[in-house]
Amino acid sequence: MNIVEKTDAEILAIAEPLWRDLVKYSNEGKYGEFARNFSSSLARAMDQVAAGHQFANSELARSLSPAIDTLGIIRRGEHVTVLYRQRSTKKPGEWLGRLVLGYEDGKVRIFGATLF
């Protein structure tokens, strides 16, 4: 099944635990756990040294609030993008979280995850 064929509720049931894991492992600085659900292409593209440096030196990456607001879902091709309002426990303001999901080898994987 193509993930774009799933209902919003089905997509969110998959996406929210993945996003919460990203927040948790980012806060804890655990890169291996953070990247465990990445697609093979995203995992290859991530530089572990740069990611480790980001975890160690970014106050935002280490202070993400577990409270999120889902803003919407965008379907395109074989992927869905779930948008979140993300906050920090230490920095004022809000960030846009973007989680791109799709299937790889029959399993839902993360093809992109960013904060703007």
Where are these regions (language model features)?
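Short alpha-helical interface patches
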Residues: 8-12, 38-46
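Short, charge-rich amphipathic alpha-helical segments embedded
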Residues: 43-55
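Charged/polar, solvent-exposed surface patches and flexible loops
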Residues: 17, 24, 36, 53-57
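Short, well-ordered alpha-helical segments enriched in acidic and aromatic residues
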Residues: 27-41
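Short, low-complexity N-terminal intrinsically disordered segments enriched in polar/charged residues
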Residues: 1-28
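Surface-exposed, charged secondary-structure patches
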Residues: 52-103, 112-116
